Amino acid sequence: MEVTHMLKITKFGGSSVANAEQFKKIKNIIQQDPTRRYIVVSAPGKRFAADNKITDLLYLLDAHRKYHVDASSVFKLIKNRFIEIKNELGLKQPIEKELDAFYTNLNQMSQAVIVSRGEYFCAKLMAEYLGYAFVDAKDIIRFKLDKSIDWDATSAKLQAKYAQYDHFVFPGFYGTSANGHIQVFPRGGGDITGAILAKCLHADVYENWTDVSGFLMADPTIVKNPKGITHITYS
Protein backbone atom coordinates (compact mmCIF):
# COMPACT_ATOMS: atom_id res chain seq x y z
CA MET A 1 0.00 0.00 0.00
CA GLU A 2 1.30 3.45 -0.92
CA VAL A 3 1.77 5.72 2.08
CA THR A 4 1.05 9.40 1.51
CA HIS A 5 1.79 12.27 3.84
CA MET A 6 -0.31 14.77 1.91
CA LEU A 7 -2.60 16.85 4.11
CA LYS A 8 -6.01 18.01 2.94
CA ILE A 9 -8.45 20.27 4.74
CA THR A 10 -11.93 19.36 3.55
CA LYS A 11 -14.86 21.73 3.99
CA PHE A 12 -18.51 20.77 3.46
CA GLY A 13 -21.11 23.49 3.02
CA GLY A 14 -24.69 23.64 4.23
CA SER A 15 -26.29 21.80 1.32
CA SER A 16 -23.75 19.00 1.79
CA VAL A 17 -24.81 18.44 5.42
CA ALA A 18 -28.53 19.12 4.97
CA ASN A 19 -29.75 15.69 6.05
CA ALA A 20 -28.69 12.14 6.90
CA GLU A 21 -28.35 11.14 3.24
CA GLN A 22 -25.87 13.95 2.73
CA PHE A 23 -23.92 12.81 5.80
CA LYS A 24 -23.67 9.37 4.18
CA LYS A 25 -22.29 10.91 0.99
CA ILE A 26 -19.67 12.76 3.03
CA LYS A 27 -18.60 9.57 4.77
CA ASN A 28 -18.13 7.93 1.38
CA ILE A 29 -16.06 10.90 0.16
CA ILE A 30 -13.88 10.78 3.28
CA GLN A 31 -13.35 7.03 3.07
CA GLN A 32 -12.20 7.30 -0.55
CA ASP A 33 -9.18 9.40 0.42
CA PRO A 34 -7.14 8.81 3.62
CA THR A 35 -5.62 12.29 3.37
CA ARG A 36 -9.02 13.84 4.19
CA ARG A 37 -8.43 13.79 7.94
CA TYR A 38 -9.46 17.28 9.05
CA ILE A 39 -13.04 18.23 8.24
CA VAL A 40 -14.85 21.57 8.52
CA VAL A 41 -18.65 21.70 8.37
CA SER A 42 -21.30 24.37 7.99
CA ALA A 43 -24.75 24.30 9.57
CA PRO A 44 -27.34 22.19 7.72
CA GLY A 45 -28.72 24.01 4.70
CA LYS A 46 -31.86 23.52 2.64
CA ARG A 47 -33.04 20.00 1.83
CA PHE A 48 -35.38 21.33 -0.88
CA ALA A 49 -36.21 24.71 -2.40
CA ALA A 50 -38.85 25.75 0.13
CA ASP A 51 -36.85 24.52 3.14
CA ASN A 52 -35.11 26.65 5.77
CA LYS A 53 -31.40 26.86 6.43
CA ILE A 54 -30.62 26.16 10.08
CA THR A 55 -28.63 29.40 10.36
CA ASP A 56 -31.62 31.40 9.09
CA LEU A 57 -33.78 29.72 11.73
CA LEU A 58 -31.20 30.56 14.40
CA TYR A 59 -31.23 34.23 13.41
CA LEU A 60 -35.03 34.09 13.60
CA LEU A 61 -34.77 32.44 17.02
CA ASP A 62 -32.54 35.28 18.18
CA ALA A 63 -35.01 37.87 16.88
CA HIS A 64 -37.81 36.19 18.83
CA ARG A 65 -35.63 36.29 21.94
CA LYS A 66 -34.72 39.94 21.41
CA TYR A 67 -38.34 41.06 21.03
CA HIS A 68 -39.72 38.74 23.72
CA VAL A 69 -41.81 36.66 21.32
CA ASP A 70 -42.46 32.97 21.97
CA ALA A 71 -39.77 31.10 20.05
CA SER A 72 -40.85 27.53 20.79
CA SER A 73 -42.12 26.82 17.27
CA VAL A 74 -38.86 28.02 15.71
CA PHE A 75 -36.80 26.02 18.18
CA LYS A 76 -38.85 22.91 17.42
CA LEU A 77 -37.91 23.16 13.73
CA ILE A 78 -34.22 23.43 14.64
CA LYS A 79 -34.31 20.63 17.20
CA ASN A 80 -36.26 18.25 14.98
CA ARG A 81 -33.77 18.72 12.16
CA PHE A 82 -30.82 17.61 14.27
CA ILE A 83 -32.76 14.81 15.94
CA GLU A 84 -33.82 13.52 12.53
CA ILE A 85 -30.19 13.37 11.37
CA LYS A 86 -29.12 11.68 14.60
CA ASN A 87 -31.87 9.06 14.51
CA GLU A 88 -31.51 8.23 10.81
CA LEU A 89 -27.78 7.65 11.29
CA GLY A 90 -28.24 5.66 14.52
CA LEU A 91 -26.04 8.00 16.55
CA LYS A 92 -25.88 7.75 20.33
CA GLN A 93 -24.86 11.11 21.78
CA PRO A 94 -27.56 12.80 23.89
CA ILE A 95 -27.86 15.83 21.66
CA GLU A 96 -31.50 16.33 22.69
CA LYS A 97 -30.39 17.33 26.19
CA GLU A 98 -27.83 19.79 24.86
CA LEU A 99 -30.37 21.31 22.48
CA ASP A 100 -32.90 21.68 25.29
CA ALA A 101 -30.27 23.29 27.54
CA PHE A 102 -29.44 25.68 24.70
CA TYR A 103 -33.08 26.76 24.45
CA THR A 104 -33.51 27.01 28.22
CA ASN A 105 -30.56 29.41 28.44
CA LEU A 106 -31.41 31.38 25.31
CA ASN A 107 -31.98 34.67 27.12
CA GLN A 108 -28.48 34.57 28.60
CA MET A 109 -26.83 34.14 25.19
CA SER A 110 -25.50 36.65 22.68
CA GLN A 111 -26.60 36.60 19.07
CA ALA A 112 -23.19 35.22 18.08
CA VAL A 113 -23.56 32.22 20.38
CA ILE A 114 -27.08 31.51 19.15
CA VAL A 115 -26.39 31.70 15.41
CA SER A 116 -23.19 29.64 15.68
CA ARG A 117 -24.95 26.62 17.16
CA GLY A 118 -25.87 25.20 13.76
CA GLU A 119 -22.23 24.52 12.97
CA TYR A 120 -21.57 23.38 16.53
CA PHE A 121 -24.29 20.72 16.62
CA CYS A 122 -23.63 19.62 13.04
CA ALA A 123 -19.93 19.11 13.78
CA LYS A 124 -20.73 17.07 16.89
CA LEU A 125 -22.99 14.74 14.92
CA MET A 126 -20.52 14.48 12.05
CA ALA A 127 -17.65 13.68 14.42
CA GLU A 128 -19.56 10.80 15.95
CA TYR A 129 -20.68 9.52 12.55
CA LEU A 130 -17.15 9.52 11.13
CA GLY A 131 -15.54 8.29 14.36
CA TYR A 132 -13.41 11.45 14.50
CA ALA A 133 -12.64 13.77 17.40
CA PHE A 134 -14.72 16.93 17.78
CA VAL A 135 -12.65 20.10 18.15
CA ASP A 136 -14.63 23.22 19.07
CA ALA A 137 -13.75 26.35 17.09
CA LYS A 138 -14.21 28.50 20.19
CA ASP A 139 -11.14 26.87 21.71
CA ILE A 140 -9.00 27.42 18.60
CA ILE A 141 -9.91 30.39 16.39
CA ARG A 142 -8.82 33.64 18.05
CA PHE A 143 -9.75 37.18 17.00
CA LYS A 144 -7.95 40.39 17.89
CA LEU A 145 -9.71 43.49 19.23
CA ASP A 146 -10.00 44.83 15.67
CA LYS A 147 -11.80 41.57 14.72
CA SER A 148 -8.95 40.34 12.54
CA ILE A 149 -7.53 36.85 13.07
CA ASP A 150 -4.88 36.44 15.75
CA TRP A 151 -2.73 34.22 13.57
CA ASP A 152 -0.08 33.41 16.17
CA ALA A 153 -2.58 32.24 18.80
CA THR A 154 -4.80 30.41 16.31
CA SER A 155 -1.89 28.65 14.62
CA ALA A 156 -0.40 27.51 17.93
CA LYS A 157 -3.72 26.06 19.07
CA LEU A 158 -4.33 24.32 15.75
CA GLN A 159 -0.84 22.84 15.69
CA ALA A 160 -1.46 21.43 19.18
CA LYS A 161 -4.70 19.74 18.05
CA TYR A 162 -2.98 18.46 14.92
CA ALA A 163 -0.36 16.82 17.12
CA GLN A 164 -3.07 15.40 19.40
CA TYR A 165 -5.50 14.00 16.81
CA ASP A 166 -5.03 12.14 13.54
CA HIS A 167 -8.57 13.11 12.55
CA PHE A 168 -11.04 15.73 13.73
CA VAL A 169 -14.23 17.56 12.75
CA PHE A 170 -14.29 21.32 13.21
CA PRO A 171 -17.31 23.67 13.11
CA GLY A 172 -17.04 26.62 10.75
CA PHE A 173 -18.26 30.21 11.08
CA TYR A 174 -17.10 31.16 14.58
CA GLY A 175 -14.26 31.55 17.06
CA THR A 176 -13.51 33.53 20.21
CA SER A 177 -13.00 37.28 20.51
CA ALA A 178 -10.13 38.99 22.33
CA ASN A 179 -12.57 39.47 25.22
CA GLY A 180 -13.32 35.75 25.47
CA HIS A 181 -16.75 35.76 23.81
CA ILE A 182 -18.02 33.82 20.80
CA GLN A 183 -17.51 35.83 17.62
CA VAL A 184 -18.79 34.90 14.16
CA PHE A 185 -17.56 35.56 10.65
CA PRO A 186 -19.89 37.08 8.04
CA ARG A 187 -22.43 34.69 6.51
CA GLY A 188 -20.63 32.03 4.52
CA GLY A 189 -17.75 32.29 6.95
CA GLY A 190 -17.34 28.54 7.20
CA ASP A 191 -15.26 28.81 4.03
CA ILE A 192 -12.99 31.24 5.87
CA THR A 193 -12.65 28.73 8.71
CA GLY A 194 -11.51 26.07 6.27
CA ALA A 195 -8.96 28.45 4.75
CA ILE A 196 -7.62 29.30 8.23
CA LEU A 197 -7.08 25.62 8.99
CA ALA A 198 -5.39 25.10 5.63
CA LYS A 199 -3.02 28.02 6.23
CA CYS A 200 -2.17 27.23 9.85
CA LEU A 201 -1.64 23.51 9.24
CA HIS A 202 0.28 24.12 5.97
CA ALA A 203 -2.14 21.89 4.06
CA ASP A 204 -1.23 20.71 0.58
CA VAL A 205 -4.84 21.06 -0.57
CA TYR A 206 -7.95 22.89 0.65
CA GLU A 207 -11.11 21.26 -0.71
CA ASN A 208 -14.43 23.08 -0.56
CA TRP A 209 -17.31 20.72 -1.33
CA THR A 210 -20.89 21.52 -2.28
CA ASP A 211 -23.71 19.31 -3.51
CA VAL A 212 -23.10 20.47 -7.11
CA SER A 213 -20.11 19.30 -9.13
CA GLY A 214 -17.88 22.06 -10.47
CA PHE A 215 -18.76 25.67 -11.34
CA LEU A 216 -21.97 26.34 -13.24
CA MET A 217 -23.00 29.39 -15.28
CA ALA A 218 -26.31 29.66 -13.43
CA ASP A 219 -28.17 28.39 -10.37
CA PRO A 220 -29.41 24.86 -11.27
CA THR A 221 -32.47 25.35 -9.05
CA ILE A 222 -33.51 28.22 -11.34
CA VAL A 223 -32.01 27.37 -14.75
CA LYS A 224 -32.43 23.84 -16.09
CA ASN A 225 -29.17 22.08 -17.00
CA PRO A 226 -26.85 25.11 -16.87
CA LYS A 227 -23.51 24.78 -18.63
CA GLY A 228 -20.37 24.20 -16.62
CA ILE A 229 -17.32 26.46 -16.44
CA THR A 230 -14.29 24.33 -17.25
CA HIS A 231 -11.64 26.96 -16.52
CA ILE A 232 -11.78 29.85 -14.06
CA THR A 233 -9.16 32.22 -12.67
CA TYR A 234 -8.77 33.18 -9.04
CA SER A 235 -8.63 36.91 -9.78
Predicted features and spans:
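Nucleotide/pyrophosphate-binding catalytic subdomain
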Residues: 2-235
